[in-house]
Amino acid sequence: MNLDVGELSTRQLAEKGISKAQLEDRDRSVDLGVEASMRKPYGIISAQALHDVGGASEGTELRLNYQYFWQIDPRLSLIPNVGVEWLSDKRANYYYGILNSEVARGVDAYRPDQVFIPHVSLGANYVINEKVNVFGVAMQKFLPNKVQDGPLVDQSSQTNFYMAVNYKF
């Protein structure tokens, strides 16, 4: 996670009485964690625990996911996924709240504290040949009211796209 102040809407911040000069970028977290998963005929259930060891938020995130692999043909698989993320107070306040240094610059204090963020995604994997495959994901996160009510967020959801090319040596 990270937040680049330059990407925020100047107009929407102004409507909330904030200027970009009062805000700080949020550093990208460096997470260390563990994952456990259970594969069954009806899909995969997985849980992850992450902690920011890089010192950005020093917060924790827990994730719970369910996904199913749907083999369309020998080369193409679709992977629907549904899950939820829990962000600790430190993590949620760092990325979605107002920092103490920003309060000192005149921004009203705001801390959402811990939040749950549900999401859905659809992934696809296409095997090009024995050594190369392409993988992509579209994910939609549904931001809770505690996040939407903050001055840094002006939307009810967040969409992300990922793509990767894998090569087997």
Show which residues each predicted segment covers.
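Hydrophobic core residues within well-ordered beta-strands of beta-rich domains
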Residues: 62, 78, 118, 132, ...
